[in-house]
């Protein structure tokens, strides 16, 4: 059996050894809940990695959003390169659920765009849980939404062993049952191609390997894994298991039983609607449902098949839907990162989904059984959650009520102490901020500024830009990937100041930031609560010269508690450093770390090495350019290459070219 192998050059330090020991003790003692109260930059992820390596249990890591999930995925992947670290988040790039607005008689059709790469990673995650004990799944709140039941899913898997008697046509039929399609021209995920007695199959959950089955006289002579791009055989295999293309694939007999159940419910619902003189709703429901039934009968699925999940999973009315938690082994561990945000998210999902579906049922767009296609309720989630570790710098009320043990991790391994907190008058906050920014920019450090409203953030950004500050504004309309790019550019020094409202808090890892400025800190409310203030102050805790300035005309209760807690932690950290002769060291972290491994579909290490080599050669060549005409000519050449790469969908390489062009244009101004 595979074991978790933690690969790192670091040893636990500061508060980490004691925190790891206490958490492992708590898990082995059977504590249902523990809280790791760890300050920003104290290495909470490293401590959790050590706990996983010691207890040797499959682990589900729940993050509050995709950005943090991607960051955690990259970190765990680096800690456990020889184990199954997987990424399970919503596979929708865009999702518009079906809805009905009775006031305007408007029906909105379901519309969605599925990210193929994330769908592959989700399938890979469930496969890892079913096949291996050494699995770490990094997920978001999407893990509480309905998924095909593991029992049905496992009934559909196809095992092929070398030496098996296997009729070729029977094999192709089984692959079709798994919703794989034959495509001899375009060999992609969840497709297969046939060349005589050789069948190439690209598994739905695989990113870089396809499987070749060679038959001789209806016997499996050879099974091998090969690179679908080059055709190079990677290794020979004694056996292989093929999983369905979707978690919702269902055996034929279950589908036939489900169709009968749906017909019975449809008849009952039609009688109810007609008896209440809702003839339009009855006609609409009958037409839509019979169309779905016909599709299921012919193709094995239909658009919106998840609305019939009660029948497909065989669960009684009102029962909790099958979710990712059903795939977890009994001895699994649950780690909830930034639990003060993640736990309330779990509770919020059910009610919004319910009210939308009740309208659809009432007006004849769906059968009442569609209400069972839903996320888990909070009490159901509590019932299926395994042993749990809450991780947060500012635990919420739920954690306080359920914490069997609170483990503090206040002292950082680097010796860094919490930032100094100053309170300054709000009357002159903008001018004072401008002078502080000038000081930080002079020593190549970065600044975060948090305001109360969008309007205020926009006005401040314009004002700073007018005074020659390189500034950007981060707001809720910016999508996840662009947000990550903005944070990356801040760290790289493309600009110096980032202004935001509520997006500069949990988990963002920016060691270059030495100043956090909180405007109007005395305006009590959600954005200036004790928890929000501590989290925002913590953004400067990874820098040796970290400082937080709160602009306020009075000290509120939240400010007093936040400053008091920061001072308590700071005093403890300084005392530990003095007692152990530790000199604080700044954090140095590779900028490429932010979303490594979770955003680039089908990325191959060879391709990345080639791109890095090309970038080095470009840099050498560009340093030799002297005259403005040479630089201008080079810019034109690179622009042509960049547009060609974009046309070839090589966006990562095109982005590198764009960065090179920007540098050359800056040089052109100084030549």
Swiss-Prot record:
Taxonomic superkingdom: Bacteria
Disordered: annotated segments: 601-623
InterPro entries, A to Z: Helicase/UvrB_N, Helicase_ATP-bd, Helicase_C-like, P-loop_NTPase, UVR_dom, UVR_dom_sf, UvrB, UvrB_inter
Domain named UVR: residues: 632-667
A Gene Ontology molecular function term of the record: ATP binding
Domain named Helicase C-terminal: residues: 429-582
DNA repair as UniProt keyword: yes
This protein's record includes keyword DNA repair: yes
UniProt: ATP binding residues: 38-45
Residue interval(s) of motif Beta-hairpin: 91-114
GO cellular component, one term: excinuclease repair complex
Primary localisation category: cytoplasm
HAMAP family: UvrB
Main function: The UvrABC repair system catalyzes the recognition and processing of DNA lesions. A damage recognition complex composed of 2 UvrA and 2 UvrB subunits scans DNA for abnormalities. Upon binding of the UvrA(2)B(2) complex to a putative damaged site, the DNA wraps around one UvrB monomer. DNA wrap is dependent on ATP binding by UvrB and probably causes local melting of the DNA helix, facilitating insertion of UvrB beta-hairpin between the DNA strands. Then UvrB probes one DNA strand for the presence of a lesion.
Subunit structure of this chain's protein: Forms a heterotetramer with UvrA during the search for lesions. Interacts with UvrC in an incision complex.
Name by which UniProt lists this protein: UvrABC system protein B
Source species of the chain: Pseudomonas fluorescens (strain ATCC BAA-477 / NRRL B-23932 / Pf-5)
Taxonomic classification: Bacteria, Pseudomonadati, Pseudomonadota, Gammaproteobacteria, Pseudomonadales
């Amino acid at each position: 059996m595979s074991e978790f192998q933690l690969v790192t050059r670091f040893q636990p330090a500061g508060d980490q050894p004691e925190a790891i020991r206490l958490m492992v003790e708590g898990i082995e003692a059977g504590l249902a809940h523990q809280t790791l109260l760890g300050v920003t930059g104290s290495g909470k992820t490293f401590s959790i990695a050590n706990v996983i390596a010691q207890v040797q249990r499959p682990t589900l890591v729940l993050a509050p959003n995709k950005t943090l999930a991607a960051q955690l995925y990259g970190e765990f992947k680096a800690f456990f390169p020889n184990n199954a670290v997987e990424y399970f988040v919503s596979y929708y790039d865009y999702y518009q659920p079906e809805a009905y607005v009775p006031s305007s008689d408007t029906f909105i059709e379901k519309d969605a765009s599925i990210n193929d790469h994330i769908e592959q990673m989700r399938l890979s995650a469930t496969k890892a849980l079913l096949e291996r004990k050494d699995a770490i799944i990094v997920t978001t709140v999407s893990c509480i939404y309905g998924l095909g039941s593991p029992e049905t899913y496992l009934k559909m898997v196809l095992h092929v062993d070398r030496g098996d008697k296997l009729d070729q046509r029977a094999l192709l039929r089984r692959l079709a049952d798994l919703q794989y399609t034959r495509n001899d021209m375009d060999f992609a995920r969840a497709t297969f191609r046939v060349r005589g007695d050789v069948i190439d199959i690209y598994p739905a959950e695989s990113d870089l390997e396809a499987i070749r089955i060679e038959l001789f006289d209806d016997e499996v002579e050879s099974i091998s894994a090969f690179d679908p791009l080059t055709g190079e055989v990677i290794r020979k295999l004694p056996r292989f298991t093929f999983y369905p293309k979707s978690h919702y694939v269902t055996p034929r007999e279950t589908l036939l039983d489900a169709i009968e159940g749906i017909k019975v419910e449809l008849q009952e619902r039609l009688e109810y609607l007609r008896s209440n003189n809702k003839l339009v709703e009855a006609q609409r429901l009958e037409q839509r449902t019979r169309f779905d039934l016909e599709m299921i009968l012919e193709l094995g699925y239909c658009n919106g098949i998840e609305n019939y999940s009660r029948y497909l999973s065989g669960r009684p009315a009102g029962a909790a839907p099958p979710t990712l938690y059903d795939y977890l082994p009994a001895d699994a561990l649950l780690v909830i990162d930034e639990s003060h945000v993640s736990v309330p998210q779990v509770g919020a999902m059910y009610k919004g989904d319910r009210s939308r579906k009740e309208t659809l049922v009432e007006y004849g767009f769906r059968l009442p059984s569609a209400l069972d296609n839903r996320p888990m309720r909070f009490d159901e989630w509590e019932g299926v959650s395994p042993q749990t570790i809450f991780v947060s710098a500012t635990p919420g009320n739920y954690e306080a009520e359920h914490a069997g043990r609170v483990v503090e991790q206040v002292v950082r391994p680097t010796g860094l102490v919490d930032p100094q907190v100053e309170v300054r008058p709000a009357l002159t906050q903008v001018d004072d901020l401008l002078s502080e920014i000038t000081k930080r920019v002079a020593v190549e450090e970065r600044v975060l500024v948090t305001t109360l409203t969008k309007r205020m953030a926009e006005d401040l950004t314009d004002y700073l830009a007018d005074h020659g500050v390189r500034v950007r504004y981060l707001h809720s309309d910016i999508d996840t990937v662009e947000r990550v790019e903005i944070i990356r550019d801040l760290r790289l020094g493309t600009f110096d100041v980032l202004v935001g409202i509520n997006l500069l808090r949990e988990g963002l890892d920016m060691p270059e930031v030495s100043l956090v400025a909180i405007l109007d800190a005395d305006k009590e409310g959600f954005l200036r609560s004790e928890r929000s203030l501590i989290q925002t102050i913590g953004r400067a805790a990874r820098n040796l010269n970290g400082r937080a300035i709160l602009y306020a005309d009075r000290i509120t209760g939240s400010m007093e508690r936040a400053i008091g807690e920061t001072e308590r932690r700071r005093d403890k950290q300084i005392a530990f450093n003095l007692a152990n002769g530790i000199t604080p060291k700044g954090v140095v972290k590779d900028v490429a770390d932010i979303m490594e491994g979770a955003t680039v579909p089908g990325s191959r290490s060879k391709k990345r090495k080639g791109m890095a080599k090309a970038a080095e050669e470009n840099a050498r060549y560009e340093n030799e350019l002297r005259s403005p005409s040479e630089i201008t000519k080079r810019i034109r050449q690179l622009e042509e290459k960049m547009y060609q790469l974009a046309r070839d969908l090589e966006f990562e390489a095109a982005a590198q070219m764009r960065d090179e062009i920007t540098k050359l244009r800056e040089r052109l101004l100084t030549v």
